């Protein structure tokens, strides 16, 4: 995508950012695909790891390849200071990234308009051009899963992931708590001992996260999962890991870290749909494949394709679903379904909007662990 993003560094300026988006739609012209902002409640009153994670995640979004230009919007008195954000962001293109601190100007909307005009002029110079599939980074997610998730849609995504790896592309698998009980299927495919050790540490680290909060993992699966036919955590996990296909795991990356290795990557993140999809976007995913048996409307900042595990859902929720894996239950091969999916991914990479994009459904959620001041 060739978009302009407004990234609030603190929740206090969310409404300012949203008004800027409403008031400046005339700047979306030429090859620019849209002007968007991603509100969140954080950036202040956070300590320790939470503060660091918010800073890291927002800086990663600023670097996202779908954002041709970015306005970073702050208040001025928040914990996440301008200086801290610059330190986290590192070297950046001053033509591409602009900063505005609302307390430092008389009229933040007038000042914001001027900066967004500069963003628009910068973004408008880019034109769509052909690139190989090997340049794509695709996130893989499941949510609202049902009994067919591990039979139709998830194996299709897994086969797609293998096809991407064979073509030199990159895929990202997360939802660590939904690997519990089936993690061996993944760890046995780590490309070397270093990656294996990172995978073990990631899995054990998330288990310790549950233990530190005196929580058990068996609150998963959700009521909707059970209504859809999933009975146990292991049942759900065996379906979840199907999205990883059979290719070697080339790297394991932390929350907020970028994908730097071609092939299949594992990413530290929870099962929660919004949090994990945001983490995959921050890792650099150009788009996200989201399998679902129950249905969900949400979209991440990156184009989010909904893959229905069953044909009934696709028929009932036409406004949500981009791809139907249900025909597999009637005899279509997973190979054929994966080829259909690859073609759709290429079309979306080429500019075709997902159902969530058509409706303007885009949001983020940041991983939180500690106290709020």
Residue ranges of model-derived segments:
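Metallocofactor- and cofactor-centric catalytic cores in central/energy metabolism, strongly enriched
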Residues: 1-287, 294-373
């Amino acid at each position: 995508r060739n978009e302009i993003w407004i990234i609030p560094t603190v929740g206090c300026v969310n409404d300012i950012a949203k008004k800027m988006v409403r008031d400046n739609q005339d700047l979306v012209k030429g090859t620019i695909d849209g002007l968007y902002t991603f509100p969140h409640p954080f950036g202040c009153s956070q300590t320790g790891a939470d503060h660091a994670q918010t800073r890291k995640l927002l800086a990663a979004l600023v670097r996202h390849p779908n954002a041709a230009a970015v306005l970073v919007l702050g208040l001025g008195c928040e914990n996440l200071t301008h200086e801290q954000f610059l330190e986290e962001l590192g070297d950046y293109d001053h033509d591409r990234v602009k900063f505005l601190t609302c307390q430092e100007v008389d009229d933040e909307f007038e000042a914001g308009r001027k900066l967004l005009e500069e963003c628009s002029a910068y973004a408008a110079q880019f034109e769509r051009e052909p690139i190989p599939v090997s340049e794509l980074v695709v996130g893989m997610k499941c949510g609202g899963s049902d009994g067919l998730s591990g039979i139709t849609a998830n194996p299709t995504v897994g086969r797609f992931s293998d096809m991407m790896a064979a073509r030199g592309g990159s895929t990202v698998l997360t939802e660590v708590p939904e690997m519990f009980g089936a993690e061996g299927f993944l760890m046995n495919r780590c490309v070397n001992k270093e990656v294996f050790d990172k995978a073990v540490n990631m899995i054990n680290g998330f288990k310790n996260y549950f233990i530190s909060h005196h929580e058990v993992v068996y609150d998963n699966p959700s009521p909707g999962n059970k209504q859809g036919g999933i009975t146990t955590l292991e049942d759900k996990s065996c379906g979840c890991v199907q999205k990883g296909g059979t290719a070697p795991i080339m790297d394991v990356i932390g929350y907020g870290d970028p994908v730097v290795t071609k092939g299949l990557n594992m990413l530290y993140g929870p099962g929660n749909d919004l949090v994990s999809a945001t983490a995959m976007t921050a890792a650099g995913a150009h788009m996200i494949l989201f399998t679902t048996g129950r249905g969900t409307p949400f979209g991440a900042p990156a184009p989010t394709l909904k893959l229905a595990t069953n044909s009934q859902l696709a028929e009932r929720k036409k406004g949500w679903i981009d791809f139907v894996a249900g025909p597999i239950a009637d005899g279509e091969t997973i190979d054929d379904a994966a080829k259909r999916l690859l073609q759709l991914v290429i079309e979306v990479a080429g500019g075709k909007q997902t159902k969530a994009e058509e409706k303007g459904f885009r949001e983020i959620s940041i991983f939180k662990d500690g106290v709020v001041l």
